[in-house]
Amino acid sequence: MKRFFRSALLLLSVLSTAGCNRPSDKGAGISDLQTRYWNNESVRKGLYVKNVPATGVNAVSEAVICLAGWVYHATGGHCYGLFSYCLKDGGIDLTDAYASLDILKEQGVGVVRFNCGVFYSEELPAYTDHRDDYLAALRKVAAYAQQCEIGLIPSFFWNYSAVSLYYGEPYRCWGKAGSRTVGFLMRYTEDVVTALREYKSIFGWEFGNELNLQADLPNWQERFDTEDPANWTKGDDIHFAFRTFADIVRAKDPDSRMILSGNATLRPSQYHQYVENSWDTDDTGQYRAITNLFNPYPINTVTEHVYETGRKFSDCGKVSLDRQLREAMYAARTLNKAYVVGEFAGVLQSEEAYRKYYDAFLDAGVQLTLLWNFALRGDVEHSFTATEPRGQYLFGLIREYNEKYARETGK
């Protein structure tokens, strides 16, 4: 399998670069879309990806994100602790979840990513020992979000180490069929998708958070604090986990909502790490090739977390954020996948600094971007609250740029 992927990556890496066109379809503005969506009982649930046929010589078909039959453009946010911070002392208290959703609705946020699970291995008994209560609580969160007309993107396995540590297995067991880690992956995915698929508030399904950053590390002994190679997580292990997750989601979700990996922006050396265990910088073709490995079918998006204002490629040096986005979107297009910025910005020093990201995303035609992170009590790293000055202008930016998206798409 490794040999196959290396050969396929080599072929993909030599594809020529090209620009990326905006979707030719005129979509509805976000307010119009949500009105059509939330008030329509027969509508297809959630965001989904469709292919727009290519036109013209050498044109590349484009995968676009849709909602209720319209091309979807939006910027939203995160509420990392929406569910996970409600798991307290062996019980579940959803008071803060409801309060958070109330604020997000009041502030006009229409789509939110959240940790649909735990972070630490010690927290897993909330599900393993109290499965029915746990799933019932998730359903309540989804139902309340639907009442608030907020779309949710649940991220299932936020911390790569939690499940393996809980079962006393090496980290590479994410890629080992028959391991207890993969067994949990399969059970949990089926349980959560089955529990939540009936809700219109579920916009998509995401594997987890930035798993690509743990792959093929030349300094794995230092990173994982072990000399045991069974903990040297490989790109193939992550590919297997992503495929397993996505296959279950696709089988259990009759509405075929979009599926996301949850990856960070790929490391500048991600291809070289996979192929030759080195930190050498990838060129643009190698970047496109390794993007394929970390977003396998039936995942139908390419997710990146954009915190930098540019990146390096060996064939063109340090590039601007605008060029970075063009390369990322072209990589997604060559794979017939939609490009999503799953996180961006963090803590910046001014409103203008945030605008640079929003303007770049708008100009590039990125359909979905999610700002990190609203926290009701400000108790998540690099977060903002609704009452602090930064939070007030960030919520204002979300509203402002959604209005710009609406004007761009003709509604």
Where are these regions (language model features)?
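C-terminal motif of bacterial Sec signal peptides marking the signal peptidase cleavage site
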Residues: 18-19
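Active-site mouth of glycoside hydrolases
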Residues: 32-299, 309, 334-336, 348-383, ...
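Alpha-helical scaffold elements lining the catalytic groove of polysaccharide deacetylases
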Residues: 316-323
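Active-site neighborhood of phospho(di)ester-bond hydrolases with catalytic His/Asp-centered motifs
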Residues: 340-343
